[in-house]
Amino acid sequence: MSTQKSTTLYPHPFSKAYWRDAVAELKDIHMLVFAALMIALRLVMKQVSIPITPFLRINAAYFVNALGAMVFGPVFAALCAAVTDVLGYIIRPDGVYFLPFILTEIGGSVVFALFLYRAKVTTTRVMLSRFSINLFINVLLQTPIMMWYYALYMNGKQYTFTMAVPGMIKNVLMFPIESVLLTLFLGVMLPITNRLGLTYSVGHAKDALKFSKKQVVTLVM
């Protein structure tokens, strides 16, 4: 006997029901197919960069990452991130494969899911998801992993704070740009995923992903 899939939206991910629904996505054949599509698209988009300035470029894969995480949740997102990381290296090896780097792939995907999956997707949530990834994943997690990598593979050369500063500056500069582009992208995609029955925020999707004056000021500042 088939059971009807839950379409509940949650105000936060700190509930058993939220995680029960996230795990249940693994049993949904439609989600399996969608996840395979997202992995394939993410591998392709990793090769695509959008130039902002001669020194700043946006990797287009983060659009696919956010879309997938919003649809299938944190459990699937973590698995897809791990598969994408390994396949990406197999398809296009670049130096030594250092397994801890997979944590940044998984972390970014899970953070997107925690903010966007089974939630009323708003501009604030999109901005917070991007800010959390830039700070906690790209800086606070990436830095010690880089230090570990240098200690093992760079002949004793240390990864210093000075070496991490350009990456920190880049994340600060890219945050407003990435937030705006991701909000616009999800604003287009969310009505489509709603119609396909992949997300359940029907009724407020169109108006929720608009920038208020306060949000514009925050991004500009």
Predicted regions located by residue number:
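Loop-helix junctions at membrane interfaces
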Residues: 1-221
